[in-house]
Regions:
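Vicinal oxygen chelate
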Residues: 86-113
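Core segments of cupin and vicinal oxygen chelate
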Residues: 8-57
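Short beta-strand/turn micro-motifs at beta-sheet edges
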Residues: 59-65
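Short hydrophobic/aromatic beta-strand or adjacent loop that forms the aromatic wall/cage
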Residues: 35-37, 72, 110-112
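N-terminal beta-strand motif that seeds the catalytic metal site of vicinal oxygen chelate
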Residues: 1-18, 72-77
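Short, conserved charged micro-motifs
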Residues: 16, 82-87
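Short connector loops at helix/strand junctions that flank enzyme active sites
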Residues: 2, 43-45, 68-72
């Protein structure tokens, strides 16, 4: 079996979250989706599971973090060029995302949050 990673995120608006990830270039896998969770595919081995709070709570043993006041995690996506990074971030901003800090250039990589 191929190694895969499933990043599970608790979301308050499932459709809006799905639309956001679609704008970033993810696709939906309906086989692993229902009205309480959507499987969004980044690559053959990387998936983001968007789960309602109710469904997420079935898997979690602690309360769901309030991400308006706390950071629940940091996840990075590697792209081939700065232009691809800028395009993805701009698509995310158009889809309702926010960019709390400016791009940082480390020479060997760029970071946009």
């Amino acid at each position: 079996m191929a190694k895969q990673i499933f990043i599970n995120l608790a979301v308050t608006d499932l459709q809006r979250s799905m639309d956001f990830y679609t704008a970033l270039g993810f696709t939906n896998n309906p086989q692993f989706s229902d009205d309480m969770g959507k499987c969004m595919v980044w690559s053959e081995h990387i998936f983001v599971m968007l789960l309602t709070h109710e469904k997420f709570a079935n898997f979690a043993t602690k309360p769901i973090a309030d991400t308006k006041s706390s950071v629940a995690g940091l996840f990075s996506l590697a792209l081939d060029s700065v232009d691809e990074v800028n395009s993805m971030v701009n698509n995310g901003l158009k889809a309702g995302g926010t960019e709390p800090s400016e791009m940082k250039d480390y020479g060997f990589m760029q970071q946009r949050t």
